[in-house]
């Protein structure tokens, strides 16, 4: 998994 910022939801709109 790539390191993402906290609270980041790419699949949530």
From Swiss-Prot:
Location(s), subcellular: Secreted
Location of Pyrrolidone carboxylic acid modifications: 1
GO-annotated biological processes: defense response; regulation of blood pressure; vasodilation
Tissue expression per record: Expressed by the venom gland.
InterPro entries registered for this protein in UniProt: Bradykinin
One function term, GO molecular function aspect: toxin activity
Keywords: Bradykinin receptor impairing toxin, G-protein coupled receptor impairing toxin, Hypotensive agent, Pyrrolidone carboxylic acid, Secreted, Toxin, Vasoactive, Vasodilator
Pfam family, any one: Bradykinin
Source organism, top-level taxon: Eukaryota
Gene Ontology CC: extracellular region
Entry's family note: Belongs to the bradykinin-related peptide family.
Free-text function comment from the UniProt entry: Induces smooth muscle contraction. May target bradykinin receptors (BDKRB). May cause hypotension.
Name listed for the protein in its UniProt record: Waspkinin
Organism, as annotated: Parapolybia indica (Lesser paper wasp)
